[in-house]
Structure formats: C-alpha cells, structure tokens
Amino acid sequence: MSSPTRKEVADLHFMDARAKLLDLAAFLDRVDRSAGSDDHRIRGLRLALKVLSEGNKNRVAEILNQWSDPTTQPLEKSDTKAATGVWPQI
C-alpha cells in the first residue's frame, strides 16, 4: 500500500485541523481579553505556534521537547498538585 498523497491527506483531515485551529484562535482571544498575570501554559502554546510556523519536520517532537522539564534531578517536593501539560518554568 502506498503512502497517501498530500491531497488525500488534506481531503481526509483538513476540516478537523481547521476546526482545531479556529478553536485555538478563539481560546487565545479569550485569554488576551482576560485580566491577570502571565501563565506558563499560554507561553507554551505561543512557543508551539512558532514551531508550527517554521515548517520544520518532527514538529510534534519539537513541541513536546519544548514543553518538557529539562532538569535531570528530581524535585524534593512538587509545587503543584497535578501535571499542567507544560513545564512551569518555560
């Protein structure tokens, strides 16, 4: 079986990707209209958008690496109750 063409991939997945992109745009609009201090999760999303716009291959790996904790030593005590999806010191 051969790999699908770009047109075939677009035919299958474009509308889903379009909806997700519009969802993200609406989310960022809401964040930008909101009061309060900066949030590491929003910084992480904005960094990911830069990765997407650069057009390099392996975008998923690059974004996940950006969002990951680069330290090698475990913390004595966590400063959050749960994972947030983006390293807080990003």
Regions found by a protein language model. Name each.
Residues 2-90:
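Surface-exposed peri-terminal alpha-helical interaction modules
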